[in-house]
C-alpha cells in the first residue's frame, strides 16, 4: 500500500511539473541560464527547487531520500536537452540583436547623409534665390540705363537740332545784316551824291536808282530761293538721321527680345529643378516616415525563418531605395552643375553688358560737358539774336528816316530848280544857251534865298539825326564784339583745359585726325578746339591785314567823298565818313578797294577808338566744329 501511494504521488508530481513547464516555459530557461552563469548550480536542483509542489512538505515526500533522487535523475536528461535548446536560441537572439544594431547604425548613417544632402540642397536653393535676385536687379538696372540712354539721345538730338536752327538763324541774320548794311551804304552814297550834285539830279537818275533797287530785289529773291533750298537739304539730312536712329532702336529691341527669351528659358529650367527638388523632398519625407515607424515588439519566442527572410527582403528593398536615391542625387548634382555653368555664362554676359553700359555712361558724361558749354552758347546766341534784332530795328528806323529825308530832299531840290529856272526865262535864248553849256557842272552855285537856306538847314538837321542814330548802332556793335571776344576766349580756354590735356595735344598735332581711337569723343572735342583756334588765328591775321590796308588808305580821300566846304557843318557834329557804310554797288565808290567791303570804315573807326581790338580780335560767332564730325 505504501508503494502504491508513492507511485501515485510521483505521477501526480510529474503531471504538475508538465503543467508547470507548459505554463512557465519562457521564464524557466532564463532562470536556468542565470543559475548556471552566476551560481554554477546543477539544473536539477534549480528545477527541483522551482518545481517543488506546495503540498510535499506536509505529505513528507522530501523525507524519502532514495525515491526522490531516482525521480530527479530521471528528470535530468530532458532538462539538459531543453538547456541546450535554450543556449542555441540565446545565441540566435544575440546574433539577431547584433544585426538589428548594425541596421540601426546604417539607418543613422543614411539619415546623416540625407540631412547633409538636404543642407546642401538648401544652400543651393539659397544660392539660386540670391542669383535670381541679382539677375532681377541687373535687369532693372539695365532697363533704367536703357531709359537714361534714350533720354540722353533725345536731349542730344534736341540740342543738335536747336544748334542747327540757331546756326541757320545766325547765318540768316548775318546775311540780313550785310544786306541792310549794303542798303544803308547805298542810301548814304545816294544822299552824298545828291548833296554833291544837287543840280545833276533828274528823272533819269531816279529811274536808274529804281532799276538798281529792282535788281537788288531780284538778288534778294534769288538769295531767298537759295535759303529755301538749303533748308530743304537740312530737312533731308534730319530725315536721314531719324532713319538711322530708328534702325539703332530696332537693333536694341532685338537684343532685348533675345535677352528676355533667354531669361524665360532660365526660369523654366529653374521651375523644373524646383519640381525635382520637391519630389526628392517628398521621397525623403516618406523614407523618414518609414524609418520613424515604431519597430514591432521583440517576439517572445525565437523568430522563425520566414521572419528572417522578410527582414532580409526589407533590407534589400531599403538598400535599393538608397541606391536609387543616390543615383537621383547624382543626376540632380549633374543638373545643378549644368545650371551653374549656364548661370556663369549669363553672369559673364551680364558683366560684359555692364562694362558696355559703363562705357556708354562715360561717353555720355564726356558728352554732357560740351552739352553744358553748348547750352551756355545757346543762351549767348539768344542774347546775340536779341541784340541783332535791336540793331535791325534801329537800321529799319534809319532806313525809313533816310527814305523820308530823300523824299523831302527831292521836293526841296525840285523847288530850288524851279526857283533857279525862273530868272533865266526873261533874258532870251542866250541865257538858255549858257544854261545848256553850264548844265554838266557837278555843283551849281547855291542861291542865297531864304527858302534855299531853310532847305539846307533842314538837310543838315537830318544829317545830325542820322549821325546820332549811327553812333547808337556803332555802340551796340562794339558791345556785341567785346562780349563775343570775352566769351570766345573763355570757351577756348575751357576747351584747352579739359581733363588729360588732350585738347592741347590735338591742337598741336592737327585737330581730331591725330586724337586716335582711344580718345573717342574727347579727341573730337580736342579737334574741334584745334580747328576753332586755327580759324581764330586765320581771322586775326586777315583782320590785321585789313586794318593795315585801311590805315594806309584812310588818309587818301576817295573819289566819291564830299567836299569839305559843303560838309563843314556835319564835321562839327560828327564825321560822316565814320557813320556811313559805303557799298561797292554805287557809282564811283567801286574804285576804292576798301569800299568793296560794307563794314570797312566802321572797323577802321573801331580800331582807332579801341586800339586793343586790332591785336586781339575775335570771331563774332564761335561755331562748334564737332557737331558735323560726329555724324561722320
From Swiss-Prot:
The similarity annotation says: Belongs to the GOLGA6 family.
For this UniProt record, the keywords arranged alphabetically read as follows:
Coiled coil
The stretch of residues making up the signal peptide is: none
Q: Where is the sequence biased in composition, kind Polar residues? A: 38-50
**Record keywords: Magnesium included?**
no
Taking the record's annotation, the residue ranges forming a coiled coil are 85-150, 209-421
Query: Which residue intervals are annotated with compositional bias (Basic and acidic residues) in the record?
Result: 427-440, 569-578
| Skewed-composition ranges (Gly residues) | 508-520
**Which is one Gene Ontology cellular component term of this protein?**
Golgi cis cisterna
| Lineage per the UniProt record | Eukaryota, Metazoa, Chordata, Craniata, Vertebrata
Pfam families listed in its UniProt record? GM130_C, GOLGA2L5
* Keyword Glycosyltransferase tagged: no
Question: What is the designated name of this protein?
Answer: Golgin subfamily A member 8O
